[in-house]
């Protein structure tokens, strides 16, 4: 049996399947456990619908069960809940539901209806400020109906260990189920909720679920590339490059020397604790984003590389050393998605890869960061030059998929270190937040995750999902997804900038904990980035208008 075979799901008892967590998955599971839910996701899909709220609430449990039947991944966990056994953070687990009572219990714990007037944004903020319980649970979903202000929404609250972009597909699947004739017929014909569930319930079987459960990126990589010694060596070379870049002196956003006991900026309190997990947001409209694309094409950059250039330059201007000190470079910490190397079906079909993050790296020398006599004030031409440099460094680092192969060994090392450090600090009685601060550098280097284009379908009817509304009768039920709001947990001393595009508009975010950072400083940096992008878009728009007059 090969190593890759040992990484696959296997039945260990009539009621339990498991597989090892590999690479980034394992690091995320240890990080989530020892760092109070770090990296957990909160993704809200806002919608409008002709379906009454009461009807949606009646259908919601059945819709969720229907989706679990097709996507058993919704029932995975990554921490053993067997109190008599040793702590196991090394495996993904899945147990079949065999009875109606078990199904109802899972639905009660997994699908939550919020109909007390709470808004989607309020719910996103609350979920971002508490970890998912019980520890190891991978998925929970909230249906927000009848908020006092704003639109209703479907909120996926998920662990990042076995999830990522897949959360959008899971939300889309629930939308489809809410409008499906099978679910609407079951609730109409069975007014009693338990009877309605019984009408669609089918006991789960391990042998049917195993081929559908998510595989690791490392397994899919090994299947596709069949790496030998040269490929493995190439992967470790990339890891060495990343470690070397991380050791270089870098600009960054400074954390507090000691975490703030009472952060100056929070979202209020939750259960008596400040909601310090902030997910700041700015948006560039579709027209300006289109202008940005034109400008990037003209100057040989890309929108993500230009955004990154603006982030790097803004951090340098807001947080850089004084002119009398040595100029630092910039360690580029970013994530990439394995879809650049793998076919689309890897992430969509049976046994999907749900956690497909690859850790990218690059380093800007002081001369590249502040070229020539420009200093920190690069101007538009300087920003595009920096964007081209960043894009080349990213392309050079991501010129091979074989870093994926090296992540298995690296994941083992990093997860062991996380556990050892956490145990030492626990024995020393170190405060949990102080421990997270001590484990982090004094400054957070420029960090960006580019999440691409949101591809969730816009309209849902009894006939399915599409990007254009087609009603057989004007009175037919329909639901329209029109906006997305994301949050999540960044519990360590880091600031992660993120970007995504939906219906042409570009959203930029900054995720961090205000116990560790000056929230006003981060807000100023984000606003400055948006301002620089706006200037580039305006310049491109003016150029286009001038050309049109010729």
Swiss-Prot record:
Summary of the protein's practical applications: MELs not only have high potential as eco-friendly biosurfactants due to their excellent surface activity, but also have attracted considerable recent interest because of thei runique properties, including self-assembly, anti-tumor and cell differentiation induction activities, and moisturizing and hair-repairing properties.
Designated gene of the protein: MAC2
Annotated function: Acyl-CoA-dependent acyltransferase; part of the gene cluster that mediates the biosynthesis of mannosylerythritol lipids (MELs), surface-active substances that enhance the availability of water-insoluble substrates.
Entry keyword annotation includes Oxidoreductase: no
Gene3D superfamilies: Chloramphenicol acetyltransferase-like domain
EC number(s) per entry: 2.-.-.-
UniProt keyword annotation of Acyltransferase present: yes
Family indicated by similarity: Belongs to the trichothecene O-acetyltransferase family.
Keyword set, alphabetical order: Acyltransferase, Transferase
The protein's annotated pathway: Secondary metabolite biosynthesis
InterPro entries from the UniProt entry: CAT-like_dom_sf
Molecular function via GO: acyltransferase activity
EC class of the enzyme, as a word: transferase
Name of the protein in question: Acyl-CoA-dependent acyltransferase MAC2
Induction / repression: Expression is induced when cells are grown in cultures containing vegetable oil as the carbon source.
Superkingdom of origin organism: Eukaryota
């Amino acid at each position: 049996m090969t190593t890759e075979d040992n990484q696959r799901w296997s039945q260990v008892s009539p009621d339990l399947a498991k597989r090892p967590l590999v690479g980034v998955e394992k690091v995320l599971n240890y990080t989530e456990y020892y760092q109070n839910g770090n990296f957990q996701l909160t993704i809200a899909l806002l919608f409008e619908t002709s379906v009454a709220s009461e009807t949606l609430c009646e259908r919601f449990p059945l819709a969720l069960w229907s989706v679990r039947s097709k996507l058993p991944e919704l029932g995975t966990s990554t921490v053993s809940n067997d109190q008599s056994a040793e702590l196991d953070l090394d495996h993904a687990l899945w147990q079949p539901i065999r009875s109606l009572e078990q199904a109802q219990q899972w639905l009660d714990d997994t699908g939550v209806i919020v109909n007390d007037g709470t808004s989607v944004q309020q719910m996103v903020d609350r979920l971002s400020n508490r970890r998912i319980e019980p520890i190891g649970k991978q998925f929970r979903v909230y249906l927000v109906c009848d908020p006092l202000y704003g639109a209703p929404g479907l909120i996926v609250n998920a662990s990042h260990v076995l999830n990522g972009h897949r959360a959008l597909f899971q939300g889309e699947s629930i939308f489809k189920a809410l409008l499906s004739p099978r679910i609407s017929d079951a609730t109409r014909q069975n007014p009693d909720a338990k009877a309605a569930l019984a009408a669609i319930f089918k006991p789960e079987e391990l042998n049917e679920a195993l081929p559908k459960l998510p595989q690791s990126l490392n397994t899919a990589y090994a299947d596709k590339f069949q790496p030998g010694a040269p490929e493995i060596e190439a992967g470790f070379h990339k890891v060495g490059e990343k470690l070397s870049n991380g050791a270089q002196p870098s600009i960054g956003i400074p954390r507090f020397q000691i975490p703030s006991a009472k952060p100056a900026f929070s979202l209020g309190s939750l259960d008596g604790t400040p909601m310090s997990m902030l997910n700041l947001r700015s948006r560039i409209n579709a027209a300006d984003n289109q202008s940005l694309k034109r400008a990037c094409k003209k100057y040989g950059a890309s929108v993500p590389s230009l955004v990154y250039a603006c982030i790097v330059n803004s951090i340098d201007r807001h947080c850089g050393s004084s002119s009398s000190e040595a100029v630092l470079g910039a360690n580029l910490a970013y994530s990439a998605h394995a879809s650049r190397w793998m076919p689309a079906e890897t992430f969509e079909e049976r046994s999907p890869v749900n956690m497909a993050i690859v850790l990218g790296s690059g380093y800007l020398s002081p001369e590249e960061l502040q070229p020539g006599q420009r200093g920190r004030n690069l101007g538009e031409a300087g920003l595009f030059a920096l964007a081209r440099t960043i894009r080349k460094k990213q392309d050079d680092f991501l010129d091979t998929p074989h870093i994926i192969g090296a992540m298995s060994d690296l994941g083992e090392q990093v997860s062991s270190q996380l556990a050892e450090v956490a145990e030492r600090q626990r024995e020393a009685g170190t405060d949990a937040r102080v421990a997270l601060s001590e484990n982090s550098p004094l400054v957070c280097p420029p960090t960006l995750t580019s999440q691409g284009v949101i591809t969730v379908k816009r309209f849902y009817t009894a006939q399915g999902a599409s990007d254009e509304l087609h009603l057989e009768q004007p009175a037919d039920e329909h639901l329209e997804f029109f906006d997305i709001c994301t949050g999540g947990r960044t519990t360590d001393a880091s600031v992660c900038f993120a970007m995504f595009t939906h219906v042409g508009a570009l959203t930029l975010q900054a995720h961090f904990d205000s116990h560790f950072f000056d929230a006003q400083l981060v807000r100023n940096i984000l606003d400055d980035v948006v301002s620089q992008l706006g200037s580039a878009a305006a310049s491109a728009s003016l150029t286009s208008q001038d050309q049109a007059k010729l």
